[in-house]
Amino acid sequence: QPWFNNGLHNLKHKAVDAQVIKEKNGNVKLTFTVVSQAPNAAQLQSKNGRYDSGIHTLIEHNDRPFGENDFKFTSNQIWTIYPDGSIELQSAITSSNPGVVLARLGYEMQVPAQLDQLAYYGRGPIDNYNDRKTGQFIEQFKSTVAKEFINFPKPQQMGNHEETRWASISNKAGKGLVVVNEQPYAFSALNHSAMDMTMATHPHRLPKSDVNYVTIDAMVTGLGGNSCGQGGPLPHDRAFGAPTRMGFIIRPMGAKGGVEVSTASQKPLL
Protein backbone atom coordinates (compact mmCIF):
# COMPACT_ATOMS: atom_id res chain seq x y z
CA GLN A 1 0.00 0.00 0.00
CA PRO A 2 2.82 2.56 0.59
CA TRP A 3 3.69 2.32 -3.12
CA PHE A 4 0.10 3.17 -4.02
CA ASN A 5 0.16 6.03 -1.51
CA ASN A 6 3.02 7.54 -3.53
CA GLY A 7 1.35 6.75 -6.85
CA LEU A 8 4.22 4.56 -8.05
CA HIS A 9 1.80 2.45 -10.10
CA ASN A 10 0.78 5.42 -12.23
CA LEU A 11 3.80 7.67 -12.79
CA LYS A 12 3.42 10.26 -15.54
CA HIS A 13 6.59 11.58 -17.14
CA LYS A 14 7.04 15.19 -18.17
CA ALA A 15 10.12 16.60 -19.88
CA VAL A 16 10.74 20.04 -18.38
CA ASP A 17 13.90 20.64 -20.41
CA ALA A 18 15.13 19.16 -23.68
CA GLN A 19 18.01 19.62 -26.11
CA VAL A 20 19.01 17.89 -29.34
CA ILE A 21 22.66 17.81 -30.41
CA LYS A 22 23.78 16.43 -33.78
CA GLU A 23 27.43 15.40 -33.80
CA LYS A 24 29.76 15.32 -36.79
CA ASN A 25 30.30 11.57 -36.45
CA GLY A 26 26.61 10.93 -37.06
CA ASN A 27 25.57 10.48 -33.45
CA VAL A 28 22.51 12.30 -32.15
CA LYS A 29 22.32 13.22 -28.46
CA LEU A 30 19.03 14.03 -26.79
CA THR A 31 19.16 15.43 -23.26
CA PHE A 32 16.13 15.67 -21.03
CA THR A 33 15.22 16.66 -17.52
CA VAL A 34 12.20 14.53 -16.69
CA VAL A 35 9.85 14.85 -13.72
CA SER A 36 7.93 11.65 -12.94
CA GLN A 37 4.92 11.97 -10.66
CA ALA A 38 1.51 10.36 -10.35
CA PRO A 39 -1.65 12.50 -10.58
CA ASN A 40 -2.76 11.23 -7.16
CA ALA A 41 -2.51 8.46 -4.61
CA ALA A 42 -4.56 5.27 -4.74
CA GLN A 43 -5.75 2.50 -2.46
CA LEU A 44 -5.92 -1.22 -3.18
CA GLN A 45 -9.01 -2.87 -1.75
CA SER A 46 -10.06 -6.51 -1.67
CA LYS A 47 -13.43 -8.10 -1.07
CA ASN A 48 -14.09 -8.60 2.64
CA GLY A 49 -10.59 -7.29 3.29
CA ARG A 50 -9.07 -10.56 2.08
CA TYR A 51 -6.17 -10.29 -0.34
CA ASP A 52 -7.00 -13.73 -1.77
CA SER A 53 -10.73 -13.07 -2.23
CA GLY A 54 -10.59 -13.16 -6.02
CA ILE A 55 -11.66 -9.54 -6.46
CA HIS A 56 -9.33 -6.55 -6.23
CA THR A 57 -10.30 -2.95 -6.75
CA LEU A 58 -7.98 0.02 -7.11
CA ILE A 59 -9.49 3.26 -5.88
CA GLU A 60 -7.83 6.36 -7.32
CA HIS A 61 -8.01 9.41 -5.05
CA ASN A 62 -8.77 11.80 -7.91
CA ASP A 63 -10.25 14.31 -5.48
CA ARG A 64 -6.80 14.81 -3.92
CA PRO A 65 -4.39 15.64 -6.74
CA PHE A 66 -0.68 15.60 -6.03
CA GLY A 67 1.16 18.89 -5.79
CA GLU A 68 4.72 20.17 -5.72
CA ASN A 69 5.43 18.68 -2.28
CA ASP A 70 4.18 15.17 -3.03
CA PHE A 71 6.42 12.30 -4.06
CA LYS A 72 8.17 12.51 -7.43
CA PHE A 73 11.31 11.53 -9.29
CA THR A 74 13.56 13.87 -11.25
CA SER A 75 15.96 12.37 -13.74
CA ASN A 76 18.58 13.89 -15.99
CA GLN A 77 18.81 11.72 -19.09
CA ILE A 78 21.25 11.71 -22.00
CA TRP A 79 20.15 9.52 -24.90
CA THR A 80 22.68 8.87 -27.66
CA ILE A 81 21.52 7.38 -30.95
CA TYR A 82 24.33 5.83 -32.99
CA PRO A 83 24.38 5.32 -36.77
CA ASP A 84 24.22 1.52 -36.34
CA GLY A 85 20.89 1.80 -34.51
CA SER A 86 22.27 1.44 -30.99
CA ILE A 87 20.71 3.60 -28.29
CA GLU A 88 22.59 4.53 -25.12
CA LEU A 89 21.12 6.03 -21.97
CA GLN A 90 22.99 7.78 -19.17
CA SER A 91 20.65 8.68 -16.33
CA ALA A 92 20.94 10.37 -12.94
CA ILE A 93 17.83 9.78 -10.83
CA THR A 94 16.78 11.56 -7.64
CA SER A 95 13.54 11.62 -5.69
CA SER A 96 11.80 13.99 -3.32
CA ASN A 97 12.13 11.40 -0.54
CA PRO A 98 15.51 9.61 -0.58
CA GLY A 99 14.44 7.36 2.30
CA VAL A 100 11.38 5.87 0.61
CA VAL A 101 11.61 2.12 -0.07
CA LEU A 102 10.91 1.14 -3.68
CA ALA A 103 10.16 -2.22 -5.23
CA ARG A 104 12.78 -1.46 -7.89
CA LEU A 105 14.60 1.49 -9.40
CA GLY A 106 15.34 1.50 -13.09
CA TYR A 107 13.58 1.36 -16.44
CA GLU A 108 10.95 -0.83 -18.05
CA MET A 109 10.25 -1.26 -21.74
CA GLN A 110 7.58 -3.12 -23.66
CA VAL A 111 8.51 -5.24 -26.67
CA PRO A 112 6.28 -7.30 -29.00
CA ALA A 113 5.36 -10.68 -27.57
CA GLN A 114 7.08 -12.31 -30.56
CA LEU A 115 10.37 -11.35 -28.89
CA ASP A 116 10.30 -14.23 -26.43
CA GLN A 117 13.73 -15.87 -26.66
CA LEU A 118 16.11 -14.89 -23.84
CA ALA A 119 19.84 -15.13 -23.33
CA TYR A 120 21.71 -13.51 -20.47
CA TYR A 121 24.99 -13.53 -18.62
CA GLY A 122 24.14 -13.22 -14.95
CA ARG A 123 22.79 -15.18 -12.02
CA GLY A 124 20.49 -18.03 -12.92
CA PRO A 125 18.78 -20.10 -14.07
CA ILE A 126 16.34 -19.78 -11.14
CA ASP A 127 15.16 -16.25 -10.40
CA ASN A 128 17.02 -14.52 -7.58
CA TYR A 129 17.11 -11.34 -5.53
CA ASN A 130 19.61 -9.33 -3.51
CA ASP A 131 19.09 -11.41 -0.40
CA ARG A 132 18.67 -14.74 -2.24
CA LYS A 133 21.18 -14.82 -5.04
CA THR A 134 24.37 -16.62 -4.03
CA GLY A 135 22.80 -20.02 -4.69
CA GLN A 136 22.51 -19.09 -8.37
CA PHE A 137 25.83 -18.87 -10.17
CA ILE A 138 26.92 -16.30 -12.74
CA GLU A 139 26.89 -18.02 -16.10
CA GLN A 140 25.50 -17.60 -19.60
CA PHE A 141 21.94 -18.93 -19.78
CA LYS A 142 19.21 -19.32 -22.36
CA SER A 143 15.52 -19.24 -21.55
CA THR A 144 12.17 -18.05 -22.85
CA VAL A 145 9.70 -15.52 -21.50
CA ALA A 146 7.24 -18.36 -20.88
CA LYS A 147 9.79 -20.27 -18.77
CA GLU A 148 10.40 -17.18 -16.61
CA PHE A 149 6.79 -17.33 -15.38
CA ILE A 150 6.29 -19.19 -12.09
CA ASN A 151 2.80 -20.51 -11.43
CA PHE A 152 2.41 -19.13 -7.90
CA PRO A 153 -1.11 -19.48 -6.42
CA LYS A 154 -1.06 -15.67 -6.15
CA PRO A 155 0.74 -13.98 -9.07
CA GLN A 156 3.59 -11.77 -7.93
CA GLN A 157 6.88 -10.34 -9.10
CA MET A 158 9.18 -13.07 -10.37
CA GLY A 159 11.89 -13.82 -12.89
CA ASN A 160 14.49 -11.39 -11.58
CA HIS A 161 18.17 -12.10 -12.33
CA GLU A 162 20.77 -10.21 -10.31
CA GLU A 163 24.28 -9.20 -11.42
CA THR A 164 23.44 -9.42 -15.11
CA ARG A 165 26.24 -8.31 -17.45
CA TRP A 166 24.17 -8.44 -20.63
CA ALA A 167 20.80 -9.77 -21.67
CA SER A 168 19.16 -10.26 -25.04
CA ILE A 169 15.57 -10.80 -26.12
CA SER A 170 14.77 -11.88 -29.65
CA ASN A 171 12.30 -13.70 -31.84
CA LYS A 172 12.81 -17.26 -33.01
CA ALA A 173 14.75 -15.97 -36.04
CA GLY A 174 17.29 -14.34 -33.73
CA LYS A 175 16.27 -10.75 -34.40
CA GLY A 176 15.89 -8.52 -31.39
CA LEU A 177 18.03 -6.49 -29.03
CA VAL A 178 20.73 -6.85 -26.42
CA VAL A 179 21.08 -4.67 -23.32
CA VAL A 180 24.51 -4.04 -21.83
CA ASN A 181 24.99 -2.01 -18.66
CA GLU A 182 28.05 -0.18 -17.36
CA GLN A 183 27.66 -2.10 -14.10
CA PRO A 184 25.94 -5.44 -13.38
CA TYR A 185 22.20 -4.89 -13.22
CA ALA A 186 18.96 -6.69 -12.39
CA PHE A 187 17.04 -8.02 -15.38
CA SER A 188 13.66 -9.63 -15.96
CA ALA A 189 11.39 -10.36 -18.92
CA LEU A 190 7.77 -11.37 -18.34
CA ASN A 191 4.52 -11.46 -20.30
CA HIS A 192 2.64 -9.67 -17.54
CA SER A 193 3.12 -6.25 -15.98
CA ALA A 194 3.68 -5.73 -12.28
CA MET A 195 0.23 -4.16 -12.07
CA ASP A 196 -1.41 -7.14 -13.80
CA MET A 197 0.16 -9.48 -11.26
CA THR A 198 -0.82 -7.25 -8.34
CA MET A 199 -4.47 -7.13 -9.38
CA ALA A 200 -4.81 -10.84 -10.25
CA THR A 201 -5.55 -13.06 -7.27
CA HIS A 202 -4.89 -16.30 -9.19
CA PRO A 203 -2.98 -17.14 -12.39
CA HIS A 204 -6.13 -17.78 -14.43
CA ARG A 205 -7.19 -14.17 -13.79
CA LEU A 206 -4.12 -12.71 -15.50
CA PRO A 207 -5.11 -10.87 -18.68
CA LYS A 208 -3.63 -11.91 -22.02
CA SER A 209 -0.87 -9.60 -23.20
CA ASP A 210 0.50 -8.94 -26.69
CA VAL A 211 3.70 -7.42 -25.27
CA ASN A 212 6.51 -8.57 -23.01
CA TYR A 213 7.80 -6.40 -20.17
CA VAL A 214 11.57 -6.05 -19.87
CA THR A 215 13.02 -4.43 -16.75
CA ILE A 216 16.53 -3.01 -16.41
CA ASP A 217 17.15 -2.01 -12.82
CA ALA A 218 19.97 -0.51 -10.83
CA MET A 219 18.45 -2.03 -7.68
CA VAL A 220 15.60 -4.39 -6.77
CA THR A 221 14.38 -4.79 -3.19
CA GLY A 222 15.01 -8.25 -1.74
CA LEU A 223 12.34 -10.64 -0.53
CA GLY A 224 13.04 -10.75 3.19
CA GLY A 225 11.31 -13.40 5.27
CA ASN A 226 7.82 -12.03 5.89
CA SER A 227 6.22 -15.29 4.79
CA CYS A 228 7.87 -17.04 7.74
CA GLY A 229 7.74 -14.20 10.23
CA GLN A 230 11.36 -13.02 10.15
CA GLY A 231 10.49 -9.61 8.77
CA GLY A 232 11.30 -7.65 5.64
CA PRO A 233 14.62 -7.40 3.80
CA LEU A 234 17.59 -5.79 5.51
CA PRO A 235 18.32 -2.14 4.63
CA HIS A 236 21.24 -2.98 2.33
CA ASP A 237 18.94 -5.28 0.34
CA ARG A 238 16.35 -2.58 -0.33
CA ALA A 239 15.98 -0.13 -3.18
CA PHE A 240 15.64 3.45 -1.96
CA GLY A 241 14.75 6.72 -3.62
CA ALA A 242 18.30 7.96 -2.99
CA PRO A 243 20.33 9.54 -5.83
CA THR A 244 21.24 6.83 -8.34
CA ARG A 245 23.23 6.82 -11.56
CA MET A 246 22.86 4.13 -14.17
CA GLY A 247 23.64 3.70 -17.82
CA PHE A 248 23.04 1.05 -20.46
CA ILE A 249 23.12 0.59 -24.20
CA ILE A 250 20.51 -1.16 -26.34
CA ARG A 251 21.96 -2.68 -29.49
CA PRO A 252 20.21 -4.40 -32.41
CA MET A 253 20.95 -8.05 -33.00
CA GLY A 254 20.24 -10.44 -35.81
CA ALA A 255 20.26 -7.83 -38.57
CA LYS A 256 23.22 -7.13 -40.86
CA GLY A 257 25.80 -5.23 -38.86
CA GLY A 258 24.02 -6.04 -35.61
CA VAL A 259 25.77 -6.97 -32.40
CA GLU A 260 27.06 -10.41 -31.60
CA VAL A 261 27.95 -11.62 -28.14
CA SER A 262 31.42 -12.93 -27.45
CA THR A 263 31.40 -16.18 -25.51
CA ALA A 264 35.07 -15.64 -24.67
CA SER A 265 34.77 -12.36 -22.83
CA GLN A 266 31.01 -12.58 -22.14
CA LYS A 267 30.69 -9.00 -23.38
CA PRO A 268 29.21 -7.63 -26.60
CA LEU A 269 31.63 -6.96 -29.39
CA LEU A 270 31.72 -3.21 -29.86
Cite the ranges covered by each PLM segment:
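Beta-strand/loop-rich accessory regions of lumenal/periplasmic or secreted enzymes
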Residues: 1-270
